[in-house]
Amino acid sequence: MALNDFHVSEPYTLGIELEMQVINPPSYDLSQDSSTLIDAVKPQLTAGEIKHDITESMLEMATGVCRDIDQAAAQLSAMQHVILQAASEHHLGICGGGTHPFQKWQRQEVCDNERYQRTLENFGYLIQQATVFGQHVHVGCANGDDAIYLLHGLSHFVPHFIALSAASPYMQGSDTRFACARLNIFSAFPDNGPMPWVSNWQEFAGLFRRLSYTTMIDSIKDLHWDIRPNPAFGTVEVRVMDTPLTLDHAINMAGLIQATAHWLLTERPFKPQEQDYLLYKFNRFQACRYGLEGVITDAYTGDRRRLADDTLRLLDNVTPSARKLGADSAIDALRLQVKKGGNEAQYMREFIADGGSLIGLVQKHCEIWAGQ
């Protein structure tokens, strides 16, 4: 199957997708009523899109193309208001977090959608297990070769993005001992982790053609790499973040990725090489397991660095780009987060350690998303 030409888009424009949990009080288990909610809110939207994801307990909020994080925040805030109002009318709750802490995957109903039903046929129970919730950020690129360079550059910072956004310590009623357990769900998928090595857009088109021979790949949407190019949108999409508990944190993560993209494409600090990925999965694992306390290893020198320290270095590097893009508030907020030494996974564990229950934790997450 041939790949679409790369659609030229304005560099550094943004798109944000948030996969939200639809909750059923008073049990605070996942609901299976996302279709009802989506039908109720669609006529009220003035910008962005609200749509299904894999199962009936998931709802996706997606912005349109945005110039900067302020425009993205305005669109997401408007969608948030509409969704919360409809959820209240239908006696449902909405919250973030990368996993629901005690849902059972066997109870999850795959959406009655041709693509998702085909995916269920291909992957079986793995699709129901993939009832997890992530944030995806698209960044515009001028051409396909820039997109491939940007993808490789951003891959250096996958552990940093994971550690900052980690919000999935609990699954199936248990503490997983991971800061981000969500990404482990995808380890059984054949397209898990980094994209196979290519050096330019022409090589990527050849890779996609060969992948399509498997009959499991019909479009870019069928590839679940940590970062992927999207020729139809003219973007590179970063997919490793847990859905945050607050809209503010989602915006901050998007601002970091936008600023990092600007720094990478203007400064070109790396010459991408296949060997860059030798320790990719080890460093990714450190971020998932330990969050900002993880230790990453340089594939060339063997140097080992705390993720917290290396994240501060990244934030310093991208600060000039953030100022140009109007994203400096995001960088400042994330810098403060790192210096305080925490992420949302840590907050969740503290809630339980203080005597809270997993049901109470989900209730609290719904209150946080509603601004209570």
Curated annotation (Swiss-Prot):
Reaction catalysis annotation: L-cysteine + L-glutamate + ATP = gamma-L-glutamyl-L-cysteine + ADP + phosphate + H(+)
Keywords tagged on the record: ATP-binding, Ligase, Nucleotide-binding
Lineage: Bacteria, Pseudomonadati, Pseudomonadota, Gammaproteobacteria, Enterobacterales
Subunit structure, as described in the record: Homodimer.
MF-aspect GO terms: ATP binding; glutamate-cysteine ligase activity
InterPro entries (alphabetical): GCL_type2/YbdK_subfam, GCS2, Gln_synth/guanido_kin_cat_dom, YbdK
Function: ATP-dependent carboxylate-amine ligase which exhibits weak glutamate--cysteine ligase activity.
Protein family membership: Belongs to the glutamate--cysteine ligase type 2 family. YbdK subfamily.
EC number assigned by the record: 6.3.2.2
Gene Ontology BP terms: modified amino acid biosynthetic process
NCBIfam families attached to this UniProt entry: gshA_cyan_rel, PRK13516.1
Enzyme class: ligase
Official protein name in the record: Putative glutamate--cysteine ligase 2
